[in-house]
Regions:
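Active-site entrance/lid segments in N-terminal catalytic domains of soluble metabolic enzymes
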Residues: 1-174
């Protein structure tokens, strides 16, 4: 089954598997598709570990990385606290997530009461650039931004490295 996607990436099937599991990335790519590592929330150090493992097992097959890098780089000065980042999440999103958990009988009464930890470093310009640089230090064929249009830094770096870019969107009006 040939397509433009197959020709573009040198894959046998126009199948892309977005996954957080490095094993799945490798197996999909080795089977003729393209595995794409969903690296949202990974620290640069963790992403390096995962990509190094993929490189050692993928037998030269193409793969991609899906990151979170806001186009606006909203937190340019890196000074937002976890509480401020939590406050940026729309109330509708919090309510939607809580409703899903409630339908599954997960207690949600204190879900947002704890102090947020370890989140949001990628939302700043420096954090996003760091994780993007880790991805480009590996032989990736595709880089995708999970938050829509990639920031200019990612686009420029992809052009420089000859890597295709992609954007995920949640609704057709995006």
């Amino acid at each position: 089954m040939k397509s433009k996607v197959c020709d573009m990436f040198g894959i046998e099937f126009p199948l892309m598997a977005f996954t957080h599991c490095r094993d799945v990335v490798v197996e999909v790519s080795k089977a003729g598709g393209m595995g794409v590592l969903g690296a949202a929330g990974f620290s640069p150090e963790q992403l390096e570990i995962e990509l190094k493992w993929i490189d050692e097992h993928i037998e030269g097959k193409p793969y991609g990385v899906d990151l979170i890098a806001p186009t606006t780089m909203a937190n340019k000065d890196e000074s937002a606290t976890p509480e401020e980042l939590h406050a940026m999440v729309p109330e509708e999103h919090k309510n939607f997530a809580a409703s899903i958990l409630a339908r599954r009988n997960v207690d949600t009464k204190d879900i947002y009461d704890g102090k947020p930890t370890g989140v949001g470093g990628f939302l700043g310009e420096k954090g996003a650039a760091n994780i993007i640089d880790v991805a480009f230090a590996h032989p990736i064929s595709l880089i995708v931004n999970a938050l829509g249009v990639p920031p200019q830094y990612m686009i420029d770096k992809a052009k420089e490295e000859g890597v295709a870019t992609g954007a995920l969107v949640g609704a057709k009006h995006h």
